[in-house]
Amino acid sequence: MGQKINPHGFRLGITTDWKSRWYADKQYAEYVKEDVAIRKLLATGMERAGIAKVEIERTRDRVRVDIHTARPGIVIGRRGAEADRIRSELEKLTGKQVQLNILEVKNAEAEAQLVAQGVAEQLSNRVAFRRAMRKAIQSAMRQPNVKGIRVQCSGRLGGAEMSRSEFYREGRVPLHTLRADIDYGLYEAKTTFGRIGVKVWIYKGDIVGGKRELAANVAAPAGDRPRRERPSRPRRSGATGTTATSTEAGRAATATADAPATTEQKEG
């Protein structure tokens, strides 16, 4: 059920990669708990920074943390003060040397997590939920790499007594197609009526051959990339799309073309 499962987990190893990359034997549970604590630490107090995703990579004595953010200036701080504070807190949490990389997200309106966060902030500021959803969809569809988007809000929408879910969609969002590049984001809006969950799916086209073939094609020069050619099919004739030998007219034309020429035709 591609409509229910998390799109990232559904496509792991096919078109998406893990956001935590390390190997552990007996310390597996400890590392998972540590990763959750790192992500929670970076999420609290950094709402204005627009953090799209956090990637964690571990070696024997070092932890590398990549923060993808739409506003790197807020994460770095004045003269790097904020980045130094974050690094010291992470080193205190992990007990290892931390390499902190702050990467800028160029196209924030095409990132599902940032779109969901933007809609949630508008809901917290008492903006009508339908207006916030439509505005986010229009902004995302203006981006050249976005082929489709779906935005869903769940909770006491408009202060109603009974909670419900509503969604708007524009373009294609094939959630069950494994080769589809689906970006997914989730954020909660804190309102006076309670929490409202915002989910965003953004379709950015198909990745043919999976992430390994995509990486190989990007790395290879343009002349070395394999050409994709159309498969050969039998020629068709007639308005109904039938093959040349499946109708009486087609069979007659084929028989006439294959028959030997008569004496009169040769003399003419």
From Swiss-Prot:
This is Small ribosomal subunit protein uS3. Part of the 30S ribosomal subunit. Forms a tight complex with proteins S10 and S14. Residues 237-268 have a biased composition (Low complexity). GO terms for cellular component: cytosolic small ribosomal subunit. The keyword Ribonucleoprotein applies. GO terms for biological process: translation. Keywords: Ribonucleoprotein, Ribosomal protein, RNA-binding, rRNA-binding. Belongs to the universal ribosomal protein uS3 family. The gene is rpsC. Transmembrane segments: none annotated. GO terms for molecular function: mRNA binding; rRNA binding; structural constituent of ribosome.
